[in-house]
Each structure stands twice: as C-alpha cells, then as structure tokens.
Amino acid sequence: MKSAATIDWLTFTVKMVTDPVEVIKRFLYMDSNLFADNDFGKFGYRKSMQFGGIMVYYDPAQGRKLEMGVCVSMTGVGCRTFEQHTRLTAAGTPLRALIEQIYISDNVHCTRLDLALDDKDKLLDLDRIADAVESGCVNSRIRKRTIYRTYDNANAAGTTVYIGAPASDFRIRFYDKAKEKYENTDERYYMHWVRLEMVMRGKNADGCVAAICNSDDLGLLASAILNDKLAFVERDSDSNISRCHICKWWLDFVDAVAAVKLVEKEDVPHKLERSIEWIKDQVAPSLSLIYDAKGFFLIREVLALGFDKRSRQQQALLDDYRNCYHVEEV
C-alpha cells in the first residue's frame, strides 16, 4: 500500500467545562484568536467557534451546561488544520498525542472517529465491490448496504458503496478519493485512489481511542477491525456464507492494511499561504492597474489601510505563520 492510514474525522466532548477558549488551549494547544465566533451551534449547543474545519461548540441549553460541556468536531480538513497549527507535538504525531490526551482525561469522551485507509495499488476496485454487494457476496453482521453510482452524461463518474446505516455506530464507506479531491481537468483526477473509511461513533469511537492508545501498530488494529466486521467471499453451493472462501483481492488488501502506519503530519499549505495564492490569482491584476495608473505610493497607502483594518483573527494567523516557519520581521 502506497499510502498510510489517516484520521479523517474526530469529535470529542469535554464535560464539566463551559469555556471554549480553555478547551482550545488545553486540548488543541492552539491560539484561540485564530477562531471566529459564531452565533449558531449544533448538537444542542447554541454557539460555536470556527477555524479551518475545526468547530468548537459551547453554551448548551440551560440546565445541561456542565453535563454537555464543550464539543470539538474536526472534519478531515479540520484534522489537517490541527496538525498544521497545534503546538501539541508529544508522543509522535499531533493527532496521536491528542487522542492519548482524550483517553487519559476525566470527563472526556470521543463521540466520533473516522479512520481512512487509502489504496493506490489497485487492490480495491469499486465496481467489483459494488457487484459483490449486489450479488450477496459479503459476509458481515452489518445488514444495511447501499450503492450510489454517478454519471456524467452517459459516462460513469463514480461509485460509492456503504456498509452500514447512516446513523449506526459503525459504518464503512468505499469511494473514489481522486474524483472527490480533484477536478476532471487535473490529470490526478484519473489516478487510482480508492479510500475505505471506517466511521465509528459512541462506544465504538471510545473503544477505538482506547485501542489506538494501547497499540503500537495502527495497521494491525485496522486490519483486525476489518476482519471482525466484513469479508468479501466467493459464493458456492454452501448455504452457510461463513464457510465460503474469502476473495483473494480482499485478503491482499487486509494484509496490506496490516503494514500501514498512521501518517505523520501531512504536508499541507498554511492558511496564510493560501491567502497569498488567492491574492496572486484574484487581486494581482487590479494591483498592476493601480501601479500603472497611480504608482507604488497608492499601493503603499492601501497596504497601510489594510494594516489598520487587520482583525484579531488575521493577526493571530500571521503570528501562527511566523511561529510555524520561524519568520523574522523586517
């Protein structure tokens, strides 16, 4: 397998705490000034703070403040944002360190954890997986199976297979990550990149956190979960599906999973660098017009105006960038 495993979603609740800033500093080890304040929430919380795919929900309904505490929810983008901006570097990878902190802390529970396994070696074929599901060649206690096929005119544009119900505590999703991530004008859109995501909620999420903290080998843990949850088999005349032979391609994939490691901090651009790219793409032509029409002095005036209007969050982003890359002021 050419890619390692990644944690692609993490949600946890810190009970007996009401201050979101305390949670951001104590658990995420991030500058709370990076986060924007929102007058909306989710999961029964009325307010939130937000930064790059990380949502911190707080202020639950009256009477449940300590019971519900503060909830942190990080999407896949949020997990990468956390890796980029956190100061939490103990115990190897930042996410591993955060998971260990969740595990050892009182009144802290993981409510969702997604583990993503990527296949770039052509071990998994989405059409073959979908055909196996449709023909009943899946040995699993999970009864709900769903297949989605998308088309671009008459051409197939993607297949997604779900094993498990949307609201269940455990669900597996197979999909084409390259087609999700890239535009069809990008040559990488056509590469083989099939992702298997294991979505764990409730006790399954808490159990996975404990297992990660008590295991030095994430690959073996992931392969053990897969072996327990499902297998693709070759049906024969035997009515007992558990006695059917497991498909070689699935055995090869699970064996490959056993060898993967949790990916270390992904090489993703800092949010400030993405702002620079936006300036180049969207603003540079207008700046060149101003320069030709009025000269550089007007541009300096615009820059000074921007400095005066800089928000607390923007200043925090600059400070974070300087800390990450050890940039000195000139």
Each predicted region: which residue ranges?
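Catalytic phosphate/metal-binding cores of nucleic-acid and nucleotide-processing enzymes, i.e., regions
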Residues: 273
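Structured, helix-rich domain cores that form ligand/interaction pockets
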Residues: 1-270, 278-330
